[in-house]
């Protein structure tokens, strides 16, 4: 469809000629975003074209269900003004382009209070409870999901990567190790709601207030999953001291809200194991984007993500067989 056809469905009262339309660069998804600026008054909104929404029931579509859930619980998200399931389009509030990544890069002194606020928002999100038979509470980081992410990495980072030369024995051994790591992460009694992609590009900070986007894949899992996404971020490396402070803040707030009763040492152990899984999953995505889709903008994040692995391996012996094998097979990417 042409853009004007989407606009006719969502804004039938306004002529496309009255709007200035500019493309917004998205992340690793098939959704497309455009900023619409009303020429008469400079007011802006965002057009999102989501192929997955086309023909779906809005009452059960995860993007709408999760957005309403977060908004009802006081989590700041872009408002949805209109939607049209026939074309798969949304008209959203424009919360600007100031991502957490950009903001911290431009204002490094904000690394303290701003990240404290983001951790507080995360714990607020992880405190939300709901019906276990309904999305997003019916979904979880179960064995099937975690192993799917490991297998995606094995396929795109190793099997289909001409710069890696794994043997069949290497791949079988690695998959066995991934199965064992997955088992360590299946502590379902500790599961809470997770955003699932809680990194610095999915948090906008207009006027310094966190606004959460790209939340449609929310599901249940260990609270460390989202904390890892934020604190062991492929796109933005935080100082180790600040990471330690934020880990402590996250753990303490989980305890204060009755969401966890583990020691801080146990929290840190699961954090490392979860971080290993999460970073390996991210590597699979980056190789897929670069080698399959030809999107080389993700290439720089391969080495920065691999750089996290030695720390996990050193601290957690359970990760050593898989971690050392991955680093050896991808040694050409290790800086």
Could you tell me what each predicted segment is?
Residues 31-37, 47, 125-126, 179-225, ...:
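Active-site acidic catalytic loop and adjacent metal/ATP-binding pocket
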Residues 34-148, 152, 159, 187:
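ATP-binding pocket architecture of kinase catalytic cores
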Residues 282-335:
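ATP/Mg2+ or Mg2+-diphosphate-binding catalytic cores
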Residues 151-161, 223-260, 273-293, 305-312:
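Active-site activation/catalytic loop segments of kinase-like enzymes and analogous catalytic loops
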Residues 145, 195, 219-220, 268-276:
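Secondary-structure capping and boundary motifs in well-ordered enzyme cores
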Residues 3, 7-13, 130-139, 144-145, ...:
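An alpha-helical support segment within catalytic cores of ATP-dependent transferases
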Residues 10-19, 73-75:
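Short secondary-structure junctions
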Residues 19-34:
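ATP-binding glycine-rich phosphate-binding loop
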């Amino acid at each position: 469809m042409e853009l004007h056809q989407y606009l006719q469905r969502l804004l039938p009262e306004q002529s496309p000629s009255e709007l200035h339309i500019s493309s917004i660069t998205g992340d690793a998804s098939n959704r497309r975003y455009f900023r619409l600026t009303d020429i008469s008054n400079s007011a802006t909104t965002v057009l999102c074209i989501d192929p997955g929404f086309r023909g779906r029931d809005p009452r059960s579509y995860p993007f709408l269900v999760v957005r309403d859930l977060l908004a009802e619980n006081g989590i700041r998200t872009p408002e949805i003004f209109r939607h049209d399931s026939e074309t798969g389009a949304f008209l959203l509030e424009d919360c600007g382009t100031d991502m957490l990544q950009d903001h911290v890069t431009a204002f490094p002194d904000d690394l303290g209070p701003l990240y404290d606020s983001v951790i507080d928002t995360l714990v607020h999100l992880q405190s939300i409870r709901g019906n276990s038979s309904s999305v997003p509470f019916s979904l979880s980081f179960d064995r099937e999901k975690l192993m799917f992410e490991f297998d995606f990495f094995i396929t795109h980072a190793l099997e289909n990567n001409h710069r890696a030369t794994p043997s069949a024995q290497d791949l079988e051994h690695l998959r066995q190790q991934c199965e064992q790591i997955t088992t360590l992460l299946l502590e379902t009694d500790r599961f809470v709601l997770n955003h699932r992609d809680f990194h610095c590009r999915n948090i906008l900070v207009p006027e310094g207030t966190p606004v959460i986007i790209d939340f449609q894949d929310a599901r249940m899992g260990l609270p460390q999953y989202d904390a890892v996404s934020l604190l062991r971020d492929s796109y933005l490396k935080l100082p180790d001291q600040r990471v330690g402070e934020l880990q402590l803040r996250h753990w303490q707030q989980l305890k204060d809200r009755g969401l966890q009763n583990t020691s801080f040492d146990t929290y840190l152990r699961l954090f490392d194991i979860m971080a290993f899984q999460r970073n390996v999953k991210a590597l699979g995505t980056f190789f897929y984007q670069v080698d399959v889709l030809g999107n080389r903008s993700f290439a720089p994040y391969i080495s920065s993500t691999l750089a996290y692995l030695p720390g996990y391996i050193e601290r957690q012996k359970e990760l050593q067989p898989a971690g050392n094998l991955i680093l050896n097979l991808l040694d050409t990417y290790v800086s």
